[in-house]
Amino acid sequence: MAAIPVDDCINFVGMKFIDNTLYFVADSDENLETDYFGKLEHKLSILRNLNDQVLFINQGDQPVFEDMPDSDCTDNAPRTEFIIYMYKDSLTRGLAVTISVNYKTMSTLSCENKIISFKEMSPPESINDEGNDIIFFQRSVPGHDDKIQFESSLYKGYFLACEKEKDLFKLILKKKDENGDKSIMFTVQNKN
């Protein structure tokens, strides 16, 4: 059996160690791809914390969790239905997503400076970066079939979480606690 030639490979002409990391020097970089995220498709979703509270946008345009029956979710759809855009990731780190809401205007969740807020913007078609404040990695939680967690692509080890602050349950970004932190677990109910 003859070998079939492959045209999409990269020829390496050298190697070198820098600070205990092995780097390859490519013959030509025309086939190399930069790190990026490219938008694929989206889903309308309702997000809930482990107390079954629904994430919604309150009157102050802040993401908070509240007890809410399904009928209220439907009645308040622009504030409770989030648009989860999936992105192709040039690296394999989990499903890259943005979380947006179309309430008053299109806004996209950001964790800039580790503070959760909605930026008035539509998610871009592509992002030429390895990490970005609006990209999160959506992953299943081992041992919990229906639970999801969202890790920041910009701040490794930091996850979206639900935290009680005064009388509100707020969406925050926090460093994952290694002792089975349930505040970073969510259920995602897709509408389409």
From Swiss-Prot:
Sites annotated Cleavage: 35-36, 70-71
GO molecular function, one term: cytokine activity
Entry-linked InterPro entries: IL-18 (IPR015529), IL-1_fam (IPR000975), IL1/FGF (IPR008996)
Domain of life: Eukaryota
UniProt entry keywords in alphabetical sequence: Cytokine, Cytoplasm, Inflammatory response, Secreted
UniProt subcellular location: Cytoplasm, Cytosol; Secreted
Keyword Cytoplasm set for record: yes
Reported modifications of this chain: The pro-IL-18 precursor is processed by CASP1, CASP4 or CASP5 to yield its mature, active form. The pro-IL-18 precursor features autoinhibitory interactions between the propeptide and the post-cleavage-site region, preventing recognition by the IL18R1 receptor. Processing by CASP1, CASP4 or CASP5 induces conformational changes to generate critical receptor-binding sites. The mature form is then secreted and released in the extracellular milieu by passing through the gasdermin-D (GSDMD) pore. In contrast, cleavage by CASP3 inactivates IL18.
Entry's Gene Ontology BP terms: cellular response to lipopolysaccharide; cytokine-mediated signaling pathway; defense response to Gram-positive bacterium; establishment of skin barrier; immune response; inflammatory response; interleukin-18-mediated signaling pathway; positive regulation of inflammatory response
Gene Ontology CC annotations of this record: cytosol; extracellular space
Residue ranges listed under propeptide: 1-35
Predominant localisation class: cytoplasm
Reported function: Pro-inflammatory cytokine primarily involved in epithelial barrier repair, polarized T-helper 1 (Th1) cell and natural killer (NK) cell immune responses. Upon binding to IL18R1 and IL18RAP, forms a signaling ternary complex which activates NF-kappa-B, triggering synthesis of inflammatory mediators. Synergizes with IL12/interleukin-12 to induce IFNG synthesis from T-helper 1 (Th1) cells and natural killer (NK) cells.
Entry's family note: Belongs to the IL-1 family.
Quaternary data: Forms a ternary complex with ligand-binding receptor subunit IL18R1 and signaling receptor subunit IL18RAP at the plasma membrane. Mature IL18 first binds to IL18R1 forming a low affinity binary complex, which then interacts with IL18RAP to form a high affinity ternary complex that signals inside the cell. Interacts with cargo receptor TMED10; the interaction mediates the translocation from the cytoplasm into the ERGIC (endoplasmic reticulum-Golgi intermediate compartment) and thereby secretion.
UniProt-recorded name of the protein: Interleukin-18
Provenance organism: Felis catus (Cat)
Phylogenetic classification of the source organism: Eukaryota, Metazoa, Chordata, Craniata, Vertebrata
